[in-house]
């Protein structure tokens, strides 16, 4: 499915029901938004590990702007934008304070989202990530260690 967040359309996949039919009052299951690594990857890398939680949570796999099946011009690939995309995504779909999981690059986006929109997340789960990524420093180090070809890849 796709949702319009302004200057991009974000692809997402939902696994698990939002309502728990096994309870008399049809209680809401917690929503877990899963943010993949990259940029350049898509949500499919997370599916084998998280689908098993669909009996207790509603899982929403989200492809970041410019990744997977999401659109988004390269000029808009900014950490602020990726974080704000999550806020617009949640607002558009009526998702209130989800649990947010971020792996690698997705963890950086998740932390930035939580910092910019602190009431927009109930819990934050991080895996194999860093608090910041300095592309300019990475390119400089790649040039020093391996020349132009590795620097172009970075």
Where in this protein do the model-derived segments appear?
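Conserved alpha/beta-hydrolase "nucleophile elbow" surrounding the catalytic nucleophile
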Residues: 98, 102-104
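Conserved HGGG/HGGXW glycine-rich cap/lid loop of the alpha/beta-hydrolase fold
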Residues: 6-75, 79, 89
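Short glycine-enriched nucleophile-adjacent loop
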Residues: 107-118, 124
